């Protein structure tokens, strides 16, 4: 299973570790993914999603229904 957010499509980025002497080595910035259950009151059911912590903040701000609708329009969910 790839480490990708189900709703936003966020995935790992590539960057550099930079030492004090400015030596650079490649590294990967992973996404902070959390397996979380959300309640859909319209459908009266729970869904389990693997989402980034930043996406959970967005869901708390905008609501799960609005975020699901946006993810569907952007093609992240069917």
UniProtKB/Swiss-Prot annotation:
Pfam families: Ribosomal_L28. HAMAP family: Ribosomal_bL28 (MF_00373). This is Large ribosomal subunit protein bL28. It comes from Flavobacterium johnsoniae (strain ATCC 17061 / DSM 2064 / JCM 8514 / BCRC 14874 / CCUG 350202 / NBRC 14942 / NCIMB 11054 / UW101) (Cytophaga johnsonae). GO terms for biological process: translation. Belongs to the bacterial ribosomal protein bL28 family. PANTHER family: 39S RIBOSOMAL PROTEIN L28, MITOCHONDRIAL (PTHR13528), LARGE RIBOSOMAL SUBUNIT PROTEIN BL28M (PTHR13528:SF2). GO terms for molecular function: structural constituent of ribosome. GO terms for cellular component: ribonucleoprotein complex; ribosome. Keywords: Ribonucleoprotein, Ribosomal protein. It comes from the Bacteria.
């Amino acid at each position: 299973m790839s480490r990708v957010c189900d709703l936003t499509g966020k995935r790992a980025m590539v960057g550099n570790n930079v030492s004090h002497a400015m030596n650079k080595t490649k590294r990967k910035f992973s996404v902070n993914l959390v397996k979380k259950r959300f309640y859909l009151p319209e459908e009266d059911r729970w869904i389990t999603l693997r989402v980034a912590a930043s996406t959970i903040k967005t869901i708390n701000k905008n609501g799960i229904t609005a975020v699901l609708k946006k993810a569907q329009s952007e093609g992240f969910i069917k």
